[in-house]
């Protein structure tokens, strides 16, 4: 059986890792062993933070909706409850967008919700 030399595959693998480590500081960009560790850790952070990003954005939307609702005299919880009572099915992302960029429309929404809350209590 013929001898298999693995220089080509090893070189390709090293090159791939060093390409991923481009922009790192010190030996992490040029030394394979250190670059491998840094790249693996970076990929772990990326995996974790793709999940964290979803939570962060949801909390940001809630903060924005709460701030805008309080300007009109409602808390976030009462506002969301009122939306449910009014049968308005808007997600938090859209509500936050309205609260920041379409203040007049958001004010009308709050009026509608306030009316439903007054009816119900």
Swiss-Prot record:
GO terms for molecular function: rRNA binding; structural constituent of ribosome. Pfam families: Ribosomal_L20 (PF00453). Keywords: Ribonucleoprotein, Ribosomal protein, RNA-binding, rRNA-binding. The keyword rRNA-binding applies. Signal peptide: none annotated. One of its GO terms (cellular component) is ribosome. NCBIfam families: rplT_bact. Binds directly to 23S ribosomal RNA and is necessary for the in vitro assembly process of the 50S ribosomal subunit. It is not involved in the protein synthesizing functions of that subunit. This is Large ribosomal subunit protein bL20. It comes from Wolbachia sp. subsp. Drosophila simulans (strain wRi). The gene is rplT.
């Amino acid at each position: 059986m013929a001898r298999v030399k693995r220089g080509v595959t090893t070189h390709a693998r090293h090159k791939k890792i060093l390409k991923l480590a481009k922009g790192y500081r010190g030996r992490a960009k040029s030394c394979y062993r250190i670059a491998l560790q840094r790249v693996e850790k970076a990929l772990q952070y990326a995996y974790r933070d793709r999940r964290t990003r979803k939570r962060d954005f949801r909390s940001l939307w809630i903060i924005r909706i709460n701030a805008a609702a309080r300007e009109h005299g409602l808390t976030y919880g009462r506002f969301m409850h009122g939306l449910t009572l009014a049968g308005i099915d808007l997600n938090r992302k859209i509500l936050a967008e309205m609260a920041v960029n379409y203040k007049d429309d958001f004010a009308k929404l709050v009026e509608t919700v306030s009316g439903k809350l007054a009816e119900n209590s």
